[in-house]
Amino acid sequence: MTNIRKSHPLFKIINDSLIDLPAPSNISSWWNFGSLLGICLAIQILTGLFLAMHYTSDTTTAFQSVTHICRDVNYGWILRYLHANGASMFFICLFLHMGRGLYYGSYMYKETWNVGVILLFAVMATAFMGYVLPWGQMSFWGATVITNLLSAIPYIGTNLVEWIWGGFSVDKATLTRFFAFHFLLPFIIFALVLVHLLFLHETGSNNPTGVPSDSDMIPFHPYYTIKDMLGALVMILALLMLVLFSPDLLGDPDNYIPANPLNTPPHIKPEWYFLFAYAILRSIPNKLGGVLALVLSILILILMPLLHTSKQRSMMFRPLSQCMFWLLVADLLTLTWIGGQPVEHPFIIIGQLASILYFLLILVLMPITSIVENHLLKW
């Protein structure tokens, strides 16, 4: 008799995705982040669901309801901080996952990569709307500043912003719809994750060498299930350390002040994981130009397969390209730092140079470096 996991229509899908899936024998710990992202999504959906049971999306009570969750609901404080810091952990895993994809040429699986870029946009939208919900000062002013960027769109901009706001400013209607979308989007993300996996399993995983590994595959279970469990343990430990020892480390103190439309905070800035894009936005003096640069800083990822000029897929054996990659990482860290600084000298010029370097590296320097390497290898 055939094993039920191989014959049952539902179990067969799970079996082919997580148990009997052929996987390259040499994938490193950099391939752990996909499963870690799945765990992050599960944590976010579960903690978010329980938070939504006690949260009220009304401007008069939103801030108080979050305070009530932390003070009066059983283990409400841990739910709230798991959710807030879980988002940070989500983005850490997301950035590392994308970095792995860039380094090892995983973007050559175009469908998987493009769905991944759409996922990134969806996660960023969800995180932004979630940050508005506690209705603190940074929530209110962050929502005002970021939604206001749409007014830079010619002709329809102003109408579009007022349509999103549901009025003439960020108010009750805005908060209610942001809560609705913040609740809905994670389920759309979950559906996109399934599409992401569907495309991945069409081709199979890449591996550090970038060479096809069809001749040397091993079953996903038990080898990579146990490896993923170790990764999950380390990540959950890191998350719990953050939540239990310094839950407000990555947050903004201004968000403990209730939203006040009459009082602007000295430095309006988003959560740390958006700072690199925020720095690119601020480095261009023109409003529309800044918005375009902001969108292109993420959208540029879709061009990665087109910008791949090397004869090799992975950067594993390409030292010059490795230098360019780590320069890009350093540049993104610089942009993240600049995004959190006030708009004054010398931060303005540093931000502008880092923004130029970001686009220059991806569009010009990395493709040229790859061509140089091809010539050095006489390919």
UniProtKB/Swiss-Prot annotation:
Source domain of life: Eukaryota
Gene3D superfamilies in alphabetical order: Cytochrome Bc1 Complex, Chain C
Binding-site list for heme b b562: H83, H182
GO biological process, one term: mitochondrial electron transport, ubiquinol to cytochrome c
The keyword Transmembrane helix is assigned to this record: yes
Subunit text: The cytochrome bc1 complex contains 11 subunits: 3 respiratory subunits (MT-CYB, CYC1 and UQCRFS1), 2 core proteins (UQCRC1 and UQCRC2) and 6 low-molecular weight proteins (UQCRH/QCR6, UQCRB/QCR7, UQCRQ/QCR8, UQCR10/QCR9, UQCR11/QCR10 and a cleavage product of UQCRFS1). This cytochrome bc1 complex then forms a dimer.
Name of this protein: Cytochrome b
Protein's organism: Pteropus rufus (Madagascan flying fox)
